[in-house]
Amino acid sequence: MTNFSSLLTTIFLCIISSATGSGTIELLISSPQTVLVEPTVCANFECAAPDDLSLARKVQRRVPLRFGTGQYHGEARERIDLHLKIIEPTSNEILALQHHRPAADTEWNSDAPIVIETSRGFNVTVQLRNLCSSNYHGKRCNRYCIANAKLHWECSTHGVRRCSAGWSGEDCSNPICAGGCSNRGRCVAPNQCSCADGFNGTRCEQCLPRAGCVNGDCVNETPNTCKCRDGFIGDRCDIDIKICSLEKPCANGGICSIDSSSSTGYKCHCPFEFVGSQCKTPLSKVRCSAEHVCKNGGACISMDDTNIQCKCRRGFSGKFCEIGNHGDCSAMRCSAGETCQISGDFAICVENDELLLTTNKPAETTKSVEKWREPRKTANDEQASDELQLRLIAAICVLFSVCVIGLALVSFFFYMHSFSKWKHPSSQQAGGSTILPTTTSIPMSTTSSGTGSPVYKVCIIDSEHRGNAPGSSSDSEPDHHCPPPHRHSPPPAYSSLVLYKKVPMAADDESSFRV
């Protein structure tokens, strides 16, 4: 869309530039005599003759007069219509009246000026040029072009739009980087590259080594790597291999050696009387008062006011027990009266009288060797004992879990059995007696029959069938009904079954008794 708009703008400007011009005609008139000059200039149309609007200007003797006409705007013509009238200022005599049509040009016509011969025999010289208005270009000032620094274009002297220096493309949007960016970045502005990570420079030609690489370069032009230059070593290439010979950092007879693992790049091997990173501290000042004089758990012993000695643990040696010896007696330095022996994984120095390494006491030698091996055997026994204890604890936990589960199952079955007996009690009691359902009452009432004999009526109310209609419990006597239950206060519930026995009665009343 942007390219299409730019194309339309260009076409519109071309149409305007071919038909319209804008500017001012500048004149430069010189005369050997003082005269009045009345010019009439028509840049975009033809003039018939000098008119009343023409203004006479005074040209001093041998003093050129430079002035401009009014600004014109309209059709751009190839030639300018110029009328000149020369007047003598005192008598107003017309000395010359001429008409010229010079070609329009933005440069002065100094090579071919207009020469006007007066009637008094002297000549008046006239030069002119076409001075274009702002944004108009070309000899006829008919090319309209606006420079735009934001869009990176400018206008030539002829009004042709062109890209500014450092830009290219149809829309002047492509920056130019002289020499490119070495395929390690992209050009974002004239001669300005945006480099990829790990590269730098005007053209991204510099490979950046790893951060902290002091005296090194990239390995095979690969960023974030470090290859030391000649004469330097170390992970950061900050150790000069000539440091021992040039600086001589070890004092008091210490021997300097290159050590790339050290922060200083070297290591001092001090004589016995001095200590420190540069062998500058006398041993007499340290003695056993300082912490960790003896390394690796060695014991410090003060020999006198100026000397100390480190008694090292098994497997370590050296002046300060700083050397670990793992099964190698060649690196051990045992003192007089001691012998290096391999005990387990360590090489140790043992006094000769303690080991009793003599041919006439082989039994004691064997006992001494067994004594050194005893700690390893004890350690194995302790490990086996710990494993046995763990297994025993695990077995106890399993047995306890089984017991708890069994007890829970027994309790569950006992509870279910008891609940079943309570839910379904037996219907017969001992002695053949019948246990009736729970009842609420045994109301009895008497009525008189027609003969005067009493009639007994017994109502047995089953607690489980109390909801039935009254009187429905007796099929044999439908005309007699039990009194309705008291609806305000129900009878109390019985807590036990009631055994109803036979009701005593007279022999003659047996026929009238109904249940």
From Swiss-Prot:
Topology Extracellular: residue spans: 27-392
Lipid bilayer topology: Single-pass type I membrane protein
InterPro entries cross-referenced by the UniProt entry: DSL, EGF-like_dom, Notch_Cell-Fate_Det
Lineage, highest ranks first: Eukaryota, Metazoa, Ecdysozoa, Nematoda, Chromadorea
Region span, Disordered: 427-452, 466-494
GO cellular component: cytoplasm; nucleus; plasma membrane
UniProt keyword Lipid biosynthesis present: no
Positions with biased composition (Low complexity): 431-452
Species whose genome carries this gene: Caenorhabditis elegans
Main location: membrane
Ranges where the EGF-like domain occurs: 173-205, 203-238, 240-280, 284-322, 325-349
Function, as annotated: Probable ligand for lin-12/Notch and glp-1/Notch receptors and involved in the mediation of Notch signaling. Involved in the lin-12/Notch pathway signaling of cell fate in vulval precursor cells (VPCs), acting redundantly with dsl-1 and lag-2. Contributes to the establishment of the dorsal-ventral axis in early embryos. Involved in the specification of the blastomere cell ABp fate, probably acting as a signal from the P2 blastomere to the glp-1/Notch receptor on ABp and ABa.
Glycosylated sites: N123, N200
Record's signal peptide: 1-26
Protein's name according to its UniProt entry: Anterior pharynx in excess protein 1
Disulphide-bridged cysteine pairs: C132-C141, C145-C155, C163-C172, C177-C187, C181-C193, C195-C204, C213-C218, C228-C237, C244-C256, C250-C268, C270-C279, C288-C300, C294-C310, C312-C321
Gene that this polypeptide is encoded by: apx-1
Alphabetized PANTHER family for the sequence: CRUMBS FAMILY MEMBER, DROSOPHILA CRUMBS HOMOLOG
